[in-house]
A protein has these predicted regions:
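Intrinsically disordered, low-complexity segments enriched in polar/charged residues with Gly/Pro
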Residues: 11, 193, 299-303
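Flexible mid-to-C-terminal extensions adjoining Fe-S/redox cofactors in radical SAM and related proteins
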Residues: 233-343
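Radical SAM/AdoMet-radical enzyme domain recognition
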Residues: 8-26, 34-151
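Canonical Radical SAM [4Fe-4S] cluster-binding loop centered on the CxxxCxxC motif
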Residues: 1-5
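Short acidic, gly/pro-rich beta-turn/loop elements at beta-sheet edges
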Residues: 64, 91, 129, 157-159, ...
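Long, contiguous hydrophobic alpha-helical segments, chiefly transmembrane helices and signal peptides
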Residues: 55, 83, 123, 139, ...
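Radical SAM enzyme [4Fe-4S]-AdoMet core and its adjacent flexible, acidic
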Residues: 112-284
């Protein structure tokens, strides 16, 4: 386990490679077992990283209510919380233990201090793929900032009985399931492939919620043309950058205003008269902003060298070595390590 000083050196190397601050996710193993995690978050914040998240199973956040406050005070902006479903059978199948109460408590402790949470759902056919829309509604009810659905990848330890490499869940499966389960509230076409690292890796949908409902922003503006026009596909896009880009479009687009005014049921408290920018700032207020994502990690059955070469999601190792995320975590068909700890 690297020391805090070693982590700082690794982060400085990352800044050098990237040419400036970027998004940062502190992962593991399980990062919350480190007592110096708040110190590491502060180091990252002082180095200028734009969005700092912790990737966690939530156990320590549930057991230690003070941890969430310590992390917020240190500069943490979000938690990427492993959250596979609502029922004990899902966790028993995927994690070997019932974690339902642990997940609830972790969410509660994060909400108490205003720490944003993204639910990270590993989707396994026949286990939890029937709960996808319910998970979205649950996330909205708990005022999470989003849900990221991750079709199961055969990495490391997993129950072999749950996986058939020729009959696996894909990003398209997730999108179609959401469309079916939501009865059209969400559509598969609402999701836009993310060019970085590769369109086959990820897809995103942006929305806002008001009065307990989710409305899809992608349908109100031409998001694809927006991404191309402002070069957003080549850079990390935080909320402020997205907001500014859409605000520029609003100033020149009567079509957006017509769409917005025709949706009084979307964020009703935000639909007020006034300048386009003020309307947009209210309409897309961050606490009502919601993102749904799908990310398909590669495993030994689906590895693609072209995708690996284009990867922009890296593990940072000692001496500033950057390794594509999927490559670093890849294991053999029997679960043995291939590269972790060797590169």
């Amino acid at each position: 386990m690297p020391s805090a000083d070693e982590v700082e050196d690794m982060l400085k190397e990352l800044l050098w490679f990237e040419g400036g601050p970027t998004a940062l996710q502190l992962s593991g193993g399980e990062p919350t077992i480190r007592r110096d995690l708040p110190e590491i978050v502060t180091i990252a914040r002082d180095l200028g990283f734009k969005l700092i998240e912790v990737d966690t199973n939530g156990v320590e956040l549930a057991k230690r209510p003070e941890l969430a406050k310590e992390l917020v005070d240190a500069g943490l902006e979000g938690v990427y919380l492993q959250f596979d479903g609502f029922t004990p059978d899902v966790y028993l199948a995927l994690r070997g233990v019932d974690l339902t109460k642990i997940k609830e408590k972790a969410l509660e402790n994060c909400a108490r201090v205003g720490l944003g949470v993204t639910l990270a759902v590993t989707v396994v056919k026949g286990v939890n793929d029937g709960q996808l829309w319910d998970l979205v509604k649950y996330a909205i009810s708990r005022r999470a900032v989003g849900v990221n659905f991750q079709p199961f990848a055969a990495l490391g330890r997993y129950p072999r009985s749950l996986f058939d490499p020729l009959d696996r869940t894909t990003i398209s499966d997730v999108q179609l399931q959401l469309q079916r389960q939501s009865e059209g509230v969400l559509r598969a076409s609402d999701f836009i492939p993310v060019p970085c690292p590769d369109p086959r890796c990820s897809a995103l949908m942006y929305g806002c919620y008001g009065a307990g409902e989710l409305k899809v922003i992608n349908r109100l503006v031409e998001v694809e043309s927006l991404v191309d026009k402002y070069g957003l596909k080549d850079n990390f896009v935080d909320f402020d950058e997205l907001l500014k880009a859409v605000a520029d479009e609003v100033g020149a687009s009567r079509e957006f205003a017509r769409n917005l005014n025709s949706r009084p049921d979307c964020c009703p408290d935000a639909c007020v008269t006034g300048s386009s920018l003020r309307l947009l700032l209210e309409y897309l207020k961050p606490e009502g902003f919601f993102c749904l994502g799908c990310h398909f990690a590669q495993d030994s059955w689906t590895v693609d060298l072209k995708r690996l070469r284009k990867c922009c999601v890296h593990e940072v190792r000692s001496k500033g070595v950057l390794i594509p995320f999927c490559l670093y975590n890849m294991t053999s068909e029997d679960g043995g390590k291939l590269y972790r700890g060797k590169l």
